[in-house]
Amino acid sequence: MNLIEFPLLDQTSSNSVISTTPNDLSNWSRLSSLWPLLYGTSCCFIEFASLIGSRFDFDRYGLVPRSSPRQADLILTAGTVTMKMAPSLVRLYEQMPEPKYVIAMGACTITGGMFSTDSYSTVRGVDKLIPVDVYLPGCPPKPEAVIDALTKLRKKISREIVEDRTLSQNKNRCFTTSHKLYVRRSTHTGTYEQELLYQSPSTLDISSETFFKSKSSVPSYKLVN
């Protein structure tokens, strides 16, 4: 049994018969074999690549990198996400089967980093696009920090109920329409223009100056790129 934390065993008899719940058994199997999809766009991904070597050996955590989102249950975003890349990231997230998890690695992924000040094309935080489970700050984070983030994610998985997670994600989902980004009633806050609504493909060429509001932070109700 994995000693990371849960599932809690209800009882153990003298005959070594272990009883538990299907949900705990499912959580234990998932936290012991995470299959990540590596979405690296910048220098933070180089730090994650060092985990593959013999010094850190991330295979001992059951991590099996996948090249297809349909075979992955964890997406690790590392690096800057631009407005043109945003629909592709959301599409990859949609193609992953439930339950699925996200680790945001590095300052550029979490807040936009040094590109968020004057850049017209940088997304100020990947949580504007997809729900994030674990934030991993740093520029770049060390491999030890990546291992710590994976450990925290495994603890979170061990405590959750799959049905509750699926319901909460279905209420605030990101999805693509004709390869365009369209966010419905997001609970996240940001500096995006609130009045930008989805109209037609001919009206989607929105200037970058009107896309962000630097004066006040408002809830992002609808967003189109």
Swiss-Prot record:
Cofactor(s) the protein requires to work: [4Fe-4S] cluster
Principal location: plastid
Substrates-to-products reaction catalysed: a plastoquinone + NADH + (n+1) H(+)(in) = a plastoquinol + NAD(+) + n H(+)(out); a plastoquinone + NADPH + (n+1) H(+)(in) = a plastoquinol + NADP(+) + n H(+)(out)
Name recorded for this polypeptide: NAD(P)H-quinone oxidoreductase subunit K, chloroplastic
Lineage: Eukaryota, Viridiplantae, Streptophyta, Embryophyta, Tracheophyta
Enzyme Commission identifier(s): 7.1.1.-
Domain of life of the source: Eukaryota
UniProt-listed SUPFAM superfamilies: HydA/Nqo6-like
